[in-house]
Amino acid sequence: MDIIPVLDLSRGTAVWAQAGDRARYEPVASALVPGAVGDPVALLKAFRVRLGASSCYVADLDAIQGGAVQRAMLRELAQLETGFAGAIMVDAGAHTPESTFEVLACGASQVVIGLETLRSFTDLAEIVRVVGRGRVVFSVDLRLGSPILHPTMQDVTGANPDALSLTGQAVEAGVCSLLVLDLARIGTGCGADLGLIGAMRRRFPALRLLAGGGVLARRDLDRMRDAGCDGALVASAIHAGTITASDLADLAAAPAGAQSPSVSR
């Protein structure tokens, strides 16, 4: 299983996300780079050099909330000599082919299309068609298990769609990589929704399945892997030092669904 460090960017600063309350996000102080509070460049370098990460997830909170894409910062991050072997995934609120290409032009390896900014699954299918399915990750954005929908999407999907039905529509649109992201769990250490992850894996066995929100310690990652997760997004636990380079190396050697003897059941 891959452990994917997270950079949340607000006005050029790396911030600490907590429970999805974006108004309260503060510059992040990380054990990886003491003294470099809120410095996204220093953090990205540390993710590779000190943590041994092979990929990174970047959320442009300005763009997600309707502002301009932080083009200069995204380009600077993408051009760093980090030696990343995997993808730099960027969520910058893209919801059309044009806005997706804008993010790719900033150096993203993959673009995250978030449920909270997507207008329709027709748009998602068109993005996958013109960009290529390997460059698209669909994010099922949740709050306490309930989908976060753009007002237009509410009209498209009908009343009270659940995460599994929305994932089914994303798969029909051509998506092959999916992220389950519960904003209410982010930065809380309450653990991931293992029941939902397991249900996603059983229903959609061919998907590359990622999840984020709620990781506190190594045992959370073991349980996510055992539930069928291919990759986990982690921020707070990395900055606190409870997830280390040795954890990343150990988990990279084990496939999703492999039972871990370190998990207490």
Describe every region a protein language model picked out.
Residues 62-68, 96, 144-147, 184-190, ...:
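Short, small-residue-enriched loops and turns at beta-alpha junctions
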Residues 87-111, 126, 195-234:
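Catalytic cores of alpha/beta
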Residues 49-106, 194-197:
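N-terminal active-site wall of soluble small-molecule enzyme domains
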Residues 2-10, 56-58, 86-92, 111-113, ...:
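Hydrophobic faces of well-ordered beta-strands that scaffold small-molecule active sites
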Residues 9-30, 104-186:
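Conserved anion-binding
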Residues 123-130, 221-265:
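C-terminal helical cap(s) of enzyme catalytic domains, especially alpha/beta-barrels
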Residues 36-49, 96-101, 158-169:
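Short, acidic/polar
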Residues 14, 18-68:
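N-terminal beta-alpha supersecondary unit
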